[in-house]
Amino acid sequence: MHNLIFAILCSVAVSVLLKVARKKNIIIEQAIAFNYIVAISLSYFLLKPDFKGLEFTEYLAQSDSTPIFLALGILLPTVFIIMSKAVEFAGIVRSDAAQRLSLFLPIVASFIIFHETLSQPKIVGIILAFIGLFCILNKSNEQSAVTFKGILGLIGVWFGYGTIDILFKQVAKSGGAFPTTLFITFSLAACVMFLYLFLKRTQWTVPSFIGGIILGVLNFFNILFYIKAHQSFGQNPTLVFAGMNIGVICLGTITGAFFFKEKISQINWFGVFISLSAIFCLYYLDKILA
């Protein structure tokens, strides 16, 4: 469980960094690009990827995990870009809701792809998880009608984040080979993001570089602990998918209330309570009823 807790803490720290980035003159797109360079370095020096004596391109061509490398390497930066467009055309509240409700996809995958056993406590936990998410995401402020571009952006966010979660579970199943998978994934993601920025002819800034270093450290350990959590709960992916999503939004809500003075309604606090109850059901209820 400690891996999941560390992953949640790192993820919320990433959110806090992105929240204060613009006030510090950090261009988020540039920070994301530099973040991948840091992640590549940490993967190489800490995880020591094993290419089995092959060159980078040879390993990429021969590995059975190449589809995962390519999918994650493209999706990680692309979904970020889609998220920024969704925020622009549909608003941050709707975009955040789409990201959180993407939990539906990995939950379905847990039982269809990863063959997790569906028990009554898990059904209760899943239902409570979505009730909690809806309550936390409930906002009283009125929003304008969403445009067609906004709808496409929200669908992209929902599908993209859900697919990334499923792919990281596949990475976790690779066992000791996951350091190599992460190294290649980050390398491909860096290429995609830097290509995007060069095509935009972005003006590079020092604050963005510094922010990218910090972001890279936090993001690397967020992903590392998330994968290790999946390996620890190999037979219970629902707990990791739901626990990560719920934990991030609950801690993020509390952090926003206490550090950024964000207004949290009673129904939001009720959602936090229900969400924590969902994690209890997913982790403990099976053991209690056994």
Predicted regions and their residues:
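Polytopic alpha-helical membrane proteins, predominantly small-molecule transporters/carriers
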Residues: 1-290
